[in-house]
């Protein structure tokens, strides 16, 4: 580093050398300045003026800056663009500095470690995820420092990557950090960027001798799985290195217990539009949108978690149902709870800001306001019959002493800054009151002093005043300036007056300014003491916050059931789903001029295990199948459902194959995307799963598609035995009802009126061999000439199909090829040598084509 630079620039370069991966915000007075390459980057990304600063060399160094009081807005913009920010503060008083002011980086802000309200969505968690691998085991640890939540998940064996991807998609991390050495890291990083585009991805290699934090946070190092311990430890180290603050609010570690929840992969979450819709990625038109009548930010986040993690245990589901049912019938209690919950601020994030030292007095007022309504909430819940509500009532702590202290200490509308006074109530601290008395008596003293000086000098027009630049002064007009006594010292000359100072006024000024400075110092000290008092109760406050979040969700579900006429589904362990007059919870809310047509559903492990649904496009097949999946999911999250009556068994997984489009990120065609999704279903579904398949095989030729569709159905029927809804335009497949036990045909009822059709939206028993595609084209407004020609061609195809119809016959096992066949042996050897698990879909497809070509050559074109 050259010594030709000024000391300040040398100091900057020394700090920057240690933070080469971050944009360095360097505090200079009231601004954060950026220099050199950082200045060029910040100027471009923030659209702020790029200037130059003399730095000791001939050419000025690039520089730009932002005001410290509005820095959060600028940081938010950079974080959203994926940058990391290092905040370098002045850590000593410039007045006391001997030479250049000491500065150091006090925190590093990354996408996963933000606490700024500008970057936090109050209804969504913001997770940092750390990923580590050891042999055949993958482990992730996730923390939201804005709420204090910390959890882990691990998976081993061939399915570990799939399991980790499912959790990553559910968590939707803001930042994913991988410990160096993960196999196939590049593929996983590409996957997360395609599924969660806003997630920042990086690789971490920690320094040797890093401190240990696990026991400090969780009280013990006692974790059976070494990889879990190490992954969580690395996560905590990363947080401490970046946040550089006390993180004691991260005090509870939980395992993501996959076996306790219904499994929903990324495809199911997307296709069912649980959290985001598929049109613009917003909340509108989603299940979350329909169910969200929460009153608190904590409740909104918890509701999302309940939707993403439906329960499997019948007793836990019933416990939630009982609570929702009681809140539904007790209208007055529900309304009162909603009113009280609306007064609750985001306690989880308030205590997090208190813990890391970024809270201000307004946060303490928000905490106080929240504590004020807790006695009324407990009173409302005290006599509930629901055991869950009783337990949640017990978990709400009153914190009465803390509330009383905050009420006495903090004014109702404190300033944003905690360093400039104005926070503490009069009467809370005797010393502070005395200082305020000195500072507030200045007007009376000035009036008396002015009268005294007028009498002493005989100048009746003089005035005693004050401004922030020159302090206190005596102002005398130009015409009277010759009459001032000798002890008047000129301080400022104006156009028509002179301003003076005298020793007595100067002494008073020092006394007042000293009092104001002491007030600011004492108020800040009192604030820090209050903060410490809150920190000592953080565990109890967090428990209260979690209880309030769960209460809020239960109240929300009861409100939805009341407003939309939902019923409580009966639970069974008979592997049976029977829904009477079920309705799609989202679609019925979006209909403005129509009444949603309800439908019945029966699925079981006996005579109606696989339902084939035929009928025209636009008639409601996809809506119906999604509806069934959503009602099952809502049941398992403890919600009531839109139906007249229902009895539903829990399912371990919901799989969906509904619609498809090209995946440009991985270079896959629509058909390849479809086949990949089907392959995942066939690999991971169990007999306790619910499978939704819509138009499997439509992305290829008719006979290829029909063959694939039938083969998939047979595999599910014979091998998996899962409950399945299968919509198809291949009406030839309806004949499977006659040759496969447990397969039933249903179709969408249609009423014909001449050349027109009316979709009745009713799912009725029996298949149909008509797709009504030409009728749909007519509804879409295609030219009459095109419609007429299409009808003629359709009749030709129908005649041909009648003559050359495909016969559905029971599946017969193929005879084994003769062992002496060199051709068969050759192919067999090639196939046995393949490492199928290491193949990409494209490689597998290419290999299949090669084998087919060889089979044609060796088999004489067969």
Question: Over which residues does each language-model region extend?
Answer:
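Charged catalytic and DNA/RNA-contacting regions of genome-maintenance
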Residues: 1-326, 335, 339-342, 346-355, ...
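ATPase nucleotide-binding head domains, primarily ABC-like/P-loop NTPase cores
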Residues: 2, 36-39, 225, 295-296, ...
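Amphipathic heptad-repeat alpha-helical coiled-coil/stalk segments that mediate oligomerization
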Residues: 206-213, 263, 274, 278, ...
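Coiled-coil heptad-register positions
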Residues: 382-385, 414, 450-453, 457, ...
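Terminal-proximal interaction/regulatory segments of ATP-powered molecular machines
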Residues: 467, 835-862
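Extended, charged coiled-coil "arm/hinge" scaffolds of SMC/Rad50-like chromosome-maintenance ATPases
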Residues: 494, 498-532
